[in-house]
Amino acid sequence: MLGPFEVLETIDMIQKENLDIRTITMGISLRDCCHPDIDISCKKIYDKITRYAEKLVVTGENIEREFGIPIINKRISVTPIALIAESSESDEYVKFAEAMDKAAQTVGVDFIGGFSSLVHKGYTVGDKRLIQSIPEALSRTKLVCSSVNVASTKAGINMDAVAEMGRIIKKCAELTADSGALACAKLVVFANAVEDNPFMAGAFHGIGEPECVINVGVSGPGVVKCALEKVKGADFGTVSETIKKTAFKITRMGQLVAQEASRRLNVPFGIVDLSLAPTPAIGDSVAYILEEMGLEKCGTHGTTAALALLNDAVKKGGVMASSYVGGLSGAFIPVSEDAGMIEAAMSGALSLEKLEAMTCVCSVGLDMIVVPGDTSAETISAIIADEAAIGVVNTKTTAVRIIPAPGKKVGDKVEFGGLLGSGPVMKVNPFSSSEFIKRGGRIPAPMHSLKN
């Protein structure tokens, strides 16, 4: 039985501590939309998305109003388009992105993900065509997000794809130079991508998923920070226990919203993603949680240990609160989307190398990193390769969302607006990785991938 304290605590979490549901994401299978005629295929995609997601936004708004729980985004993820487009006799894959964008705008969602390709072991003809079309697709659409999986623990790292993605990211930046290379903020390069991720820009509806599903992503870094303020000076066991209890409460709210949305839309409930997802709002920052543990500035020595504790405690608390936990489930460290990370990067406390170390112990990887516009494609590919290696060897999801901002140099700032925030341009290592990237081929899977 809930007492008055729990009710008031929840109200405080929402009104004062930035607790919210980051996203309700509807996953839709498009496997029945394949057709040799690209125009027919695109029409089938548009019709199916608008039919299934017709009431997604209004349902989210009704739940938000009735329960008093802020739901920031309503989103859609679809089957990786490379799998659908491959049956088409046309190579104009941008048309698929435009059909997705039109459908997303029709139903009123914030983003649609799934202009994606899975090439961790090699390319098909369709994969190559889709990857080549990413820059134009993202520059010509508003709501479409793209992802490419270039590595897995079972397959190793496809270095040909890694090299190609460096060039693709540079092209994305070039085509959207007038908006601070915004297309790059809608493109993620993965190792060990998951099939049920509700978060953008990396969401896609995996081939093992049902016809349609509801996945929910929670948020609430501000709630965790406020909880830690009450245990100042306590030992790490107390810190962990405090985070666990808070994560439990946050996840219960996510479970409630997911089940309610599932019931009202008559769509199966998939998972709750436990990830602490920051926003640019002051007080809604993962970096501030780490600083509350006793670090003067996020990025100093001890940051990786603090983040490991946070990530572990969030998982332990969250899994008790939901029957199905999935997605990425941890703590996100997107630099431009986190007020504390922005401050740390601008003060010099947080470097690209330190962020890479932090990705070893948290959810996903190098996220929303702005680098100088003259950063070479090979350097970007090498950054992706490093991050993929961390994911492959540690059997975890890692990713890179990097923005080489045209005309910008170290110390400048790029404004994206909204949840994407603003990013300080960070220094990259000036020495070349070009000859390494040119080798191509595939880095073999690690020994511990042989589980059978």
Swiss-Prot record:
InterPro entries: UPF0210. Transmembrane segments: none annotated. Coiled coil: none annotated. Gene3D superfamilies: 3.20.70.20. Pfam families: DUF711 (PF05167). It comes from the Bacteria. CDD domains: RNR_PFL_like_DUF711. Homodimer. Belongs to the UPF0210 family. This is UPF0210 protein Ccel_1722.
